[in-house]
UniProtKB/Swiss-Prot annotation:
Main location: mitochondrion
UniProt-recorded name of the protein: NADH-ubiquinone oxidoreductase chain 6
One of the record's GO molecular function terms: NADH dehydrogenase (ubiquinone) activity
Keyword Oxidoreductase recorded: no
Amino acid sequence: MTYALFLLSVSLVMGFVGFSSKPSPIYGGLVLIVSGVVGCAIILNYGGGYMGLMVFLIYLGGMMVVFGYTTAMAIEEYPEAWGSGVEVLVSVLVGLAMEVGLVLWVKGYDGMVVVVNFNSVGSWMIYEGEGPGLIREDPIGAGALYDYGRWLVVVTGWTLFVGVYIVIEIARGN
């Protein structure tokens, strides 16, 4: 399972490298969609079936629609590929080599180091019981996100509204 997670992590980082060095909008959108699928697979690997499915359905469904329209508007007759420019190909290969080197370096360690320390983890305790119970952590975590992060939901909604308003104004023209 650790090797699968390392493979998914390398795929995710390589997707980001491919997106940042996109030679054509078509390939950038494709790599971003593939990176989203790999991110959903990482969430599923950690046991988050509900959140992985929601991200896959909502995020990737909307992304495919948006990138379908944007690539139709910015279509090129001969799109530039990753191998057409030497600089782009070298940067992708250097990024791949650095990622493989990092994975091999981290694989040599026996244990993992805690990077983040959660000080107030007690306030996130949703259900604490003595006996066995049928309760999933994933939907409860989504409920806690909307409860403790309600300001983030409001800011995200407002940002989406402003983005849609800007797109409508641009599409309307003069």
